[in-house]
Swiss-Prot record:
Function according to Swiss-Prot or TrEMBL: Catalyzes the conversion of glucosamine-6-phosphate to glucosamine-1-phosphate.
Organism: Acidothermus cellulolyticus (strain ATCC 43068 / DSM 8971 / 11B)
Any Gene Ontology CC annotation: cytosol
Gene name, Swiss-Prot/TrEMBL: glmM
Enzyme class of the recorded protein, top EC level: isomerase
Positions bearing Phosphoserine: S118
Name of the protein in question: Phosphoglucosamine mutase
Length: 461
């Protein structure tokens, strides 16, 4: 996967947008170079300064990363860029993305920077900027940063250059914050936790142990190269086997930067983000905390989520795919709970982004509070058979305008009627078109998805 855009010293070709739905990503040291990382940091500092974000005070940024080896040199480049632009920097070290977001707000920082490619393979990395308060930068600010890469700037000197120091206490601050969101003890629960050899490898087991659970950690030994390798939320079969082997009550899986959480019940069956969202929605409704009796989900959520929650008087607002769009809809509508099938669960009472560690604690807390097994809680959502086909190596920009694809899409929707759903969308981070089909039977979903994927490949390949 190649980074798009142009940066001084990088030799990257210009394309419409440098920032994807989750920051700038690419293969580290080929696409996402030290030069680009430094340029992005400098440009971000100056764009925010010119927007008045640093007015009247000395600016402060926090920088955190996942354990990828490439994160070390990218961190050095970002820190150098920020300090050279007059921004003081706290290096947080290896921490989950939601921890960086929390500390951006808790430390009243003007900017947060996360170096991670989340669930992507180890050679990839990414840079994501967070605004004051811990929310992702708005699209227009990201575009302004991209537009001004490599421009000459007035460089501060003397006392006006940024200072840099490590801030290891951030880890404990985040752990205490997560624990403070629940007073429900987890004593008696045996839980397998798979951290994908990623950023949650220390934090997630620590939180659950402090809450009283017996924790069996797997995928918690990062070496810089093994992130997401056979472990984590994108390799859930590893956790399924471990839960069965250990006789655990449940399993929790994170991705590389721990903004996701998927679960596994005692039988080893997956409990996905839709089901987790529904379980928490019922808990919050019961406690009188579910604003407007509504949750926010994406168009990729299973139709079973909407049907299951409707039976309890809970509405679902749908957004485009991406946790940033879920968050935007939550803030605009005054909703407090939202998420994605992939396991991004956002709880605005406690966090500004998806938080896998927090989600795991809240989910297990619901199990402990009700005394019900996870499989029983998850039955609130009857998942319709869902088939997803990723069509790679195609021109994703034409997926919405190709007449043949649109004709086939309309035919598929007519064929399935109210008993199913079809969605085509371009990935925000990869050269991929995703074909999603839900139907009453697996065979129907497979047949329609395969037909649409073939048409997309033929028309856009």
């Amino acid at each position: 996967m190649a980074v798009s855009g142009t940066a001084a010293g990088t030799g990257l070709a210009s394309t419409p947008r440098l920032f994807g739905t989750d920051g700038v990503r690419g293969i580290a040291n080929r696409d996402l170079t030290a030069e680009l990382a430094l340029d992005l940091a400098v440009a971000a500092a100056h764009v925010l300064a010119q927007a008045g974000a640093f007015e009247g005070h000395r600016p402060l940024a926090v920088v955190g990363r996942d354990p990828r080896a490439s994160g070390e040199f990218l961190e050095a480049a970002v820190v150098a860029g920020l300090a050279s632009a007059g921004v003081d920097v706290l290096r947080l070290g290896v921490l989950p993305t939601p921890a960086v977001a929390y500390l951006t707000a808790a430390l009243d920082a003007d900017l947060g920077v996360v170096l991670s490619a989340s669930h992507n393979p180890m050679p990839d990395n990414g840079i994501k900027f967070l605004a004051r308060g811990g929310h992702k930068l708005p699209d227009d600010i990201e575009d302004a940063v991209a537009a001004r890469l490599g421009e000459p700037w007035t460089r501060p000197v003397g006392r006006f250059v940024g200072r840099v120091r490590d801030y290891p206490e951030g880890l404990d601050q985040y752990v205490e914050h997560v624990l403070a969101t629940s007073d429900q003890r987890l004593d008696g629960l045996r839980v397998v936790v798979d951290c994908a050899h990623g950023a949650a490898s220390v934090v997630s087991p620590a939180v659950l142990r402090r809450a009283g659970a017996t924790v069996v950690p797997i995928g918690c030994e990062p070496d810089g190269y093994n992130i997401n390798d056979g472990h984590g939320s994108t390799n859930i079969e590893t956790l399924q086997a471990a839960v069965r082997r250990e006789g655990a009550d449940a399993g929790i899986a994170h991705d590389g930067d721990a903004d996701r959480c998927l679960a596994v019940d005692a039988a080893g069956d997956v409990v996905d983000g839709d089901q987790i969202l529904a379980i928490l929605a019922l808990a919050w409704q019961e406690a009188g905390r579910l604003a407007h009796d509504t949750v926010v989900a994406t168009v990729m959520s299973n139709l079973g989520l909407k049907l299951g929650l409707a039976a309890h008087g809970i509405s679902v607002v749908e957004t485009a795919v991406g946790d940033r769009y879920v968050l935007e809809a939550m803030r605009a509508g005054g909703y407090v709970l939202g998420g994605e099938q992939s396991g991004h669960i956002i709880m605005l009472d406690y966090a500004t982004t998806g938080d896998g560690v927090l989600t795991g604690l809240q989910l297990l807390g619901r199990m402990a509070a009700t005394g019900r097994p996870l499989a029983d809680l998850a039955r609130v959502v009857r998942r319709l058979p869902q088939v997803l086909r990723n069509v790679t190596g195609v021109d994703k920009t034409r997926v919405d305008t190709d007449p043949v694809i649109n004709k086939e899409l309309a035919a598929a929707r007519g064929e399935l009627g109210d008993g199913g759903r079809v969605l085509l969308r371009a990935s925000g981070t990869e050269p991929v078109v995703r074909v999603m089909v839900e139907a009453e039977t697996e065979a129907d979903a497979e047949r329609v998805a395969e037909r649409l994927a073939r048409v997309v490949r033929e028309r856009l390949g």
